[in-house]
Amino acid sequence: MKFSQAVQDFERYLLLDMNRSANTIQSYRRDLAKFQAYLTEQGIDNVEAIDELTVRAFLAKLSQASYAASSTSRMLSSLKQFFLFLRKEGILETNPMSLVHRPKQGRHLPKVLTAREIEALLQAPDTSSPHGLRDRAIFELMYATGLRVTELVQLKLEDLHLELGFIQTLGKGDKERLVPLIDEAIEWLEAYLEQVRPSFLRLAGSPSPQEVFLTERGKAFTRQGIWKNLNKYVALAGIKQNVSPHMLRHSFATHLLENGADLRMVQELLGHADISTTQIYTHISTQRLQEVYRKYFPRA
């Protein structure tokens, strides 16, 4: 079977049989496209011609290109699922991934913003302008909920339950979760919905977009748009380090734990399937505790 046909069948399986989200399928597609580019270089067109040595040579090439261990691990996961599917469907007699294992990943502590930096960032947008009011609502919501940027741009009007003080979102693995909101985030969100979104919506086509956050042309906001705006406000706020949207999520979790939140509660708020993923934030809090201790204890 041609590799391209096998990928199409795999994507159909993910969508129809496994009910995977469009973002999940797109991630698989990106990884398999990289693998296919390598196969093309090697003159391999059919999945039957792929063996363990082919896979290992591909992974070695990624390593030589300084591919991050986490990215290699994700690539391995994609390839494992792909070849498991081909084996299950009887397209392959053997699985070339059966003896290929994940690389060990070093522990990297996520970077976070201080409470003062968060406040400076939230104050940066000019809320007297429509764009500034929208952006203030976006960053207030991201920090108050720990939403992933993908979850934010996919948030629909029907997901807002502001009168009850929470939103619902669809996270990784299509897991739905409820996230409470503080009053200040609700106030900024309501101000955007009442004062800005209707004017942006006038330029939208039909049917009207249901996404909460829109561009001035009435289009749903994109991940790239969030990144671009964030970089602008980071500069305005005088924050010296590079800041990504995910750092707001890291900061949300870390600040909760620093102020005494229960680890299990933070796990639920973040939508982590495994609490070990959440435990990384306890290491950040411990590290910062040690920094404060060394700075202020007279004999440290």
Regions found by a protein language model. Give the residues of each.
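Conserved catalytic core of the tyrosine transesterase superfamily
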Residues: 1-300
